């Protein structure tokens, strides 16, 4: 399972200053409720026409509410030739539970 990352592993990587592109594939209303600092919003439905916003040599972390839409985004990006994409397991909800309780749950 090389295409997933746990909330705690992501936190560790961010704390080390690793250059990661956090792509949140939820809808705008969800993003307005809770988001990871430094993430960019690209709703899953707009991902195909938004590929130019991403570079193939970046390490991309896909984020959603519980990890399902971001799994779809991860698979799509891999199919489009992005070699270094990971899905945040459990999504932002797991992040809130395991890493940062200040991030609202909904």
Predicted regions and their residues:
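Short, surface-exposed ligand- or partner-binding patches at beta-edge/loop junctions that are enriched
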Residues: 63
